[in-house]
Amino acid sequence: MKMEVLSVQNHIQGKFGVNKIKDWPSSGVASTAPHPLEEEEENAVDVNAALDADVVDGHPASVLHMRQHQALNTRSTVPMAPPVAGSGKQSAVAASFDVVNGSSAAYHHAYMTNVLASTAHHPGHGHGPGPSPMPASPLQSTAGARFGAADNMDDVSASAVRDLSQQLQFQLRDAKQRHLACTEVNLPADLTERIAAEIIRMSDREPCGERACTLFIEFESEPNNVRRIASFKVDPDTVSIFELYLTLKQDKSGWTSLLPQFIKNLTRSNTINISPDFTLTKNKLYSSE
């Protein structure tokens, strides 16, 4: 009789998830060895209990999932492993600790952080080195970077560039009054400084530098129409051993270039705009052999 009760009890336990088989005392009835079928049913109950803890506790799966999620969010913070000196790489624990005890927003932030970290550690995805860093945005570019590396003035003296730039401005003002039939001459803001820096570079290997230079300034108003408007020695007390020919070009990209010449003469539109492009040619007055 006890065997049948245990069999029914095991069936109920397997259906509703009770994982502990209670002893059903029976007065006056000796306990007998369990039947092999009963042992299989007990093992099946234990396996089900181990696989599905929700059924054992009597709670639905959603409740246990909520508890597991709460327990995951209340875990203690995993200490960040210090990065290896000089490696510049972040450890896996440090990269993912925000996901362990972060909110929903923190989870997405940490996810993107881990994605970026993984792409940084594997830029080429196993196919060689990754691409070089992208250049700075236009908002971060400097004035020198707009014209390229050749116009970077870090390799020349700032005071020498300033002095030579002032000489160029003085000569251009004088040339406007004497040789250019116009009311105004507009120059790009950094044109004279870039010209001065290039003159210093081209004079770097000369015995006396730019002080032994005679500079000729020419103006090109039309293609194949070049005229000389100024010339001067950088240092009047130094003998010139080489010459530099500077050619400035008229910038005709403005709307005033479309006006007829007689209208320019009648209005204040008679303005010459100098292009930011120029040419500089060197002529040595001595033999280098």
Swiss-Prot record:
<dbReference type="GO" id="GO:0006979">
    <property type="term" value="P:response to oxidative stress"/>
</dbReference>
<keyword id="KW-0963">Cytoplasm</keyword>
<comment type="similarity">
    <text>Belongs to the DDIT4 family.</text>
</comment>
<dbReference type="InterPro" id="IPR038281">
    <property type="entry name" value="RTP801-like_C_sf"/>
</dbReference>
<keyword id="KW-0053">Apoptosis</keyword>
<protein>
    <recommendedName>
        <fullName>Protein charybde</fullName>
    </recommendedName>
</protein>
<dbReference type="GO" id="GO:0009968">
    <property type="term" value="P:negative regulation of signal transduction"/>
</dbReference>
<dbReference type="GO" id="GO:0006915">
    <property type="term" value="P:apoptotic process"/>
</dbReference>
<dbReference type="GO" id="GO:0032006">
    <property type="term" value="P:regulation of TOR signaling"/>
</dbReference>
<comment type="function">
    <text>Inhibits cell growth by regulating the Tor pathway upstream of the Tsc1-Tsc2 complex and downstream of Akt1. Acts as a cell death activator during head development.</text>
</comment>
<dbReference type="Pfam" id="PF07809">
    <property type="entry name" value="RTP801_C"/>
</dbReference>
<feature type="region of interest" description="Disordered">
    <location>
        <begin position="119"/>
        <end position="142"/>
    </location>
</feature>
<keyword id="KW-0217">Developmental protein</keyword>
<dbReference type="InterPro" id="IPR012918">
    <property type="entry name" value="RTP801-like"/>
</dbReference>
<dbReference type="GO" id="GO:0008258">
    <property type="term" value="P:head involution"/>
</dbReference>
<dbReference type="GO" id="GO:0005737">
    <property type="term" value="C:cytoplasm"/>
</dbReference>
